[in-house]
Amino acid sequence: MKRAIILVLDSFGIGAAGDAEKFGDVGSDTMGHIAEQCDKGLADNGNRKGPLTLPNLSKLGLAMAGKESTGKLAAGLDADAEIIGAYGHAAELSSGKDTPSGHWEIAGVPVLFDWGYFSDKENSFPKELTDRILARANLSGYLGNCHASGTQVLDDLGEEHMKTGMPIFYTSADSVFQIACHEETFGLDNLLTLCQIAREELEDYNIGRVIARPFIGAGKGQFERTGNRRDLSLEPPAITVLQKLVEEKNGHVHSIGKISDIYAGCGITQKTKATGIPALFDATKEAITAASDNTIVFTNFVDFDSAYGHRRDVAGYAAALEYFDGRLPEIMEMLQEDDILILTADHGCDPTWPGTDHTREHIPVLVYGHKVPAGSLGLRDTFADIGQTLAEYFEISDMEYGKSFL
């Protein structure tokens, strides 16, 4: 029986990629800089203190993968851990450093075209676009129209939104159109309908995602984004390994978290919504228990990115990594003889880096299974090596990109 479990630690880069200069990200290192801050005692909070402690990930080769990526061992990680898995680091072939590009490339389909972007920091959106969205949604106006941090924009405009009923439109360095609305005063269903309208109107702009950003709270300083986020993505430009598994083997792909949204539902046969790392872990375990032959269980742990990377919260990121590491054996112990477990990321988001955007980094590729030989996989030229490996593992037709590391 063949089953693959893929865990994406969203934004957990392990060192600047070779083309980081194009993105202004030379020297970025999500893992290394978190470890450095922890080692210096600068990432202590109520949940953690001291050096970054990731014994289980280190046994899978994380520390060594980071060393191969950057040339140095991340501070505090165990250089002498007995390696029980295959480890490597992968460069991104895709043109961007965004979530869809990273995930699609993992599934064997790199993004070789350029996304559309709203580059202007202020007055970011064309008037003809927003006019059409407002007319179709029967709205009198909107707020924002700028690049913004998702939490700061709520403090800046949340109260006005509640008073006027006008949605908050904003973007970032990614190919995104984001809409924030209060779940109670505006309504979640109304927000999702508005986002669908925006998705349709953005067809000619080649924007990767429309993101619904619902929030709650009574006023400034009290607003919180909820777990009802929704990503409306374009479909991948070619068939992914997920779709091939379903079509060629009558297989199953169980999405946990936002995976289904990222692939616009393509190749997904079952989806489970869960919010927060603990709930995502629980849902993943339940899915593994129920998984049959020719199944992929695919989980995205978005909080590393959304709650800690973008928020530049080093201590929070470190605590979340240590929690993840502590629970990882629960999944490892569930693996049957022929199963494989792959841990990876989709891009970087260095919480010590200027700004609030993603960083162009290598991603870890950690592979574990009873039949997986331990040792280095080296530098992989594309994230698509993961997709090609899955194609070989499940004995389906080859992907166009990538080389298997099995």
UniProtKB/Swiss-Prot annotation:
Its EC number is 5.4.2.7. It is found in: Cytoplasm. It is an enzyme of class 5 (isomerase). It holds the Pfam family Metalloenzyme. Transmembrane segments: none annotated. Its cofactor is Mn(2+). It comes from the Bacteria. GO terms for cellular component: cytosol. GO terms for molecular function: magnesium ion binding; manganese ion binding; phosphopentomutase activity. Mn(2+) 2 binds at D305, H310, H358. NCBIfam families: deoB (TIGR01696), PRK05362.1 (NF003766). Belongs to the phosphopentomutase family. This is Phosphopentomutase. It comes from Aliivibrio salmonicida (strain LFI1238). The lineage of its organism: Bacteria, Pseudomonadati, Pseudomonadota, Gammaproteobacteria, Vibrionales. The gene is deoB.
